[in-house]
């Protein structure tokens, strides 16, 4: 479960909309920052190919910018709406994978 689920939705929305959030200035979405867990690896495996390619490109650009100690021009920052949609999609897939893993564990017991 994501930490975002524990926080009030209004706080999460205001956090994602604020311009001081550095990940947006590098073109990343919030879900791009998730730790690489076993469940997330399965989620990435299930993503459509074009979505996965876009995510990989965002990560490569962010790594390059980080090494150069630069930020994107404001016109190229990540969009709030697309960020929210991508994060919701990843959360939905993650919940589904976790339910499947719980079901598998219950059959093993």
Swiss-Prot record:
Source organism (scientific name): Dictyostelium discoideum (Social amoeba)
Subcellular location: Mitochondrion inner membrane
Principal place of residence: mitochondrion
SUPFAM superfamilies reported in the protein's UniProt record: 14 kDa protein of cytochrome bc1 complex (Ubiquinol-cytochrome c reductase)
Function: Component of the ubiquinol-cytochrome c oxidoreductase, a multisubunit transmembrane complex that is part of the mitochondrial electron transport chain which drives oxidative phosphorylation.
One of the protein's GO biological processes: mitochondrial electron transport, ubiquinol to cytochrome c
Keywords: Electron transport, Membrane, Mitochondrion, Mitochondrion inner membrane, Respiratory chain, Transport
KW Membrane (keyword) present: yes
Membrane topology: Peripheral membrane protein
Lineage: Eukaryota, Amoebozoa, Evosea, Eumycetozoa, Dictyostelia
Any single Pfam family the record assigns to this protein: UCR_14kD
Protein name: Probable cytochrome b-c1 complex subunit 7
Subunit structure and binding partners: Component of the ubiquinol-cytochrome c oxidoreductase (cytochrome b-c1 complex, complex III, CIII), a multisubunit enzyme composed of 3 respiratory subunits cytochrome b, cytochrome c1 and Rieske protein, 2 core protein subunits, and additional low-molecular weight protein subunits. The complex exists as an obligatory dimer and forms supercomplexes (SCs) in the inner mitochondrial membrane with cytochrome c oxidase (complex IV, CIV).
Source taxon at top rank: Eukaryota
Family assignment from sequence similarity: Belongs to the UQCRB/QCR7 family.
GO cellular component: mitochondrial inner membrane; respiratory chain complex III
